Curated annotation (Swiss-Prot):
Species for this entry: Arabidopsis thaliana (Mouse-ear cress)
This protein's name: Protein AGENET DOMAIN (AGD)-CONTAINING P1
Alphabetized UniProt keyword annotations: Chromatin regulator, Nucleus
SMART domains, sorted: Agenet (SM00743)
Outcome when changing residue 134 to A: Impaired H3K9me2 binding. Disrupted H3K9me2 binding
Major localisation: nucleus
Length: 517
């Protein structure tokens, strides 16, 4: 359950008969010599915990001490909690030494637009409970203005008022994702202001973390990867051309071969070197978007994608576009247009004005969700194929295929895993688990569209399905998936992923992106 946090206990290590969760093998931002700007003595921060039962929660506090500049290997900070105390009287604030990766700046307060925004079923939120903010998913909007929130870590469902909730955000690469929605005053600009408010290449580069961008490019772009390449050549600034990587060159350059550009002989594809700041993956498709006046778009013209602005809506199948760089006005069909997106620190960012996509999350489920109760025995027959979520440390948010062998007492059962072996390495592993840790096999589904950033998925890894979030969309139907408990980022093919579903009160809550079979 989501219990009050009093003091930190040391839990016993997990048994090693299962393969552990993905462990963080990549250097974190905390390993850099330069400390994040928000880590200063006295600075307010939010603090997370690695302790079992508290993962997914954030507590307010302040920084007491930071790593010494003379100790290059130190990544530890001392913090003091605002709402947690050593004593029952609440007079001695709890102090603790934590890793820098467990700290982030305080989440931004909701904007006026977000305060008026409806919280819908399926929305990811943080709920203030037992002195901290806990990550959960809205499963029901109640008539009394309250919301039922399901917490995956504890398998609990609790009701909250709207003022006890905030929209969930992640602190990634020094920025909040998704970013804070703009205020009404900022959105109420005239169409003329929108047309004049363009970002040039220098504005985009100002938002780029060079080290992060270099590392991402080195990881993503190998030989054969489909990419887009831009140029600083006069007359071509801001235009992106389709290409593929021939081979990496040195630490931060790539030899690319263009798809539509030719050498002087007009036959062989043009090849040239480009650096990590001028290469990116192809942006995700947006066929279903209706363009509006003021939208910043890319138009395919003369073998490349050029930046323009919509000045006239759809008429007779075409849209009017204005190109600032050449001062030209032209009309294009829908197939030759796409919303403009910037590739910044490994994420796709939409323009702040015009062309803004708001993707409301919905789910297909019975909204009359009952208060949480233990899984009933009668739900599963002996021999039924099931999935089991182990209670051991290191296996949170993972599910393993098994079958039900027998029930033991009121709330226990014996299961036999399909892919996990006993200590002899031959016989299938059998284990006694709580009935609350088992569920039926998820609904088979057909994906209506490819996965997108922030989609919650299950990734097949080390014989089990692990809950993660799509962090980056790669070429060749591949994705980078972030596992929040370990902060590990791993690459998976589409065939190794399934859309995340929750088993709540005997029903599957599933995303609108799939169709049940």
């Amino acid at each position: 359950m989501l219990r009050p946090r009093r003091s930190l206990g040391v839990s016993s290590p997990a048994k090693q008969r299962k393969k552990a969760a993905p462990k963080n093998s990549m250097a974190t931002r905390a390993n850099r010599k330069r400390l994040p700007s928000y880590l200063k003595p006295g600075s307010a921060v939010e603090i997370s915990s690695d302790e079992i039962g508290f993962r997914g929660s954030w507590y307010m506090g302040k920084v007491i001490t930071i790593p010494s500049s003379s100790d290059k290997d130190s990544v530890k900070c001392q913090v003091e909690y605002t709402t947690l105390f050593f004593d029952k009287e609440g007079t001695k604030p709890l102090k603790e030494v934590v890793d820098m990766s467990q700290l982030r700046p305080p989440a931004p307060p909701m904007s006026e637009i977000e305060k008026k925004k409806k919280i819908v079923v399926g929305e990811e939120v943080d709920a203030f409970y037992n002195d901290g903010w806990w990550e959960g998913d809205v499963t029901e909007v109640l008539d009394d203005g309250k919301f039922s929130v399901f917490f995956r870590s504890s398998k609990e469902q609790i009701r909250f008022r709207k003022d006890e909730l905030r929209f969930h955000r992640e602190w990634v690469d020094g920025a909040w994702k998704p970013p804070l929605e703009e205020t009404e005053e900022e959105e109420d600009e005239s169409e003329e202001d929108k047309l004049d408010d363009s970002e040039d290449e220098e504005d985009i580069l100002a938002r780029v973390d060079l080290e992060t961008t270099r590392a991402i490019a080195k990881q993503m772009f190998s030989s054969g990867t489909v990419v887009e390449v831009s140029s600083d050549e006069e007359g071509f600034q801001g235009c992106w051309f389709a290409a593929k990587v021939v081979e990496p060159v040195g630490e931060d350059k790539f030899l690319v071969e263009y798809r539509d550009l030719r050498e002087k002989d007009g036959i062989e594809p043009l090849k040239e070197e480009t650096d990590f700041l001028h290469i990116r993956p192809p942006p995700p498709r947006d066929e279903d978007i209706d363009f509006a006046v003021g939208d910043k778009i890319n138009a395919f013209y003369n073998d490349g994608w050029w930046v323009g602005v919509v000045i006239d809506g759809m008429k007779h199948g075409t849209v009017g576009i204005y190109f600032r760089q050449s001062q030209e006005k032209m009309r294009f069909g829908r197939q030759g247009l796409r919303l403009h997106k910037d590739w910044v620190d490994g994420t796709w960012q939409l323009p702040l004005k015009g062309g803004k996509i708001k993707r409301e999350k919905t789910v297909s489920c019975n909204r009359n969700v009952r208060p949480k109760k233990a899984t009933e025995k009668q739900a599963f027959s002996i021999g039924t194929p099931i999935e089991v979520s182990p209670e051991e440390e290191g296996f949170e948010d993972s599910w393993f295929l098994a079958k039900l062998i027998e029930y033991r007492g009121k709330d226990k059962c014996l299961v036999e895993y399909d892919n996990l072996k006993a200590e002899d390495g031959k016989e299938p592993l059998r284990e006694e688990v709580n009935v609350s840790r088992i569920r039926p096999l998820p609904l088979e589904s057909v994906m209506v569209s490819p996965f997108e950033r922030h989609d919650k998925v299950n990734a097949l890894y080390n014989d089990g399905w692990w809950v993660g979030v799509i962090r980056k969309v790669l070429a060749k139907s591949s994705y980078l998936v972030l596992f929040k408990n370990t902060q590990e980022l791993l690459k998976f093919h589409h065939s190794q992923l399934r859309l995340h579903q929750e088993w709540i009160d005997g029903k599957w809550i599933t995303s609108f992106k799939s169709q049940k079979v």
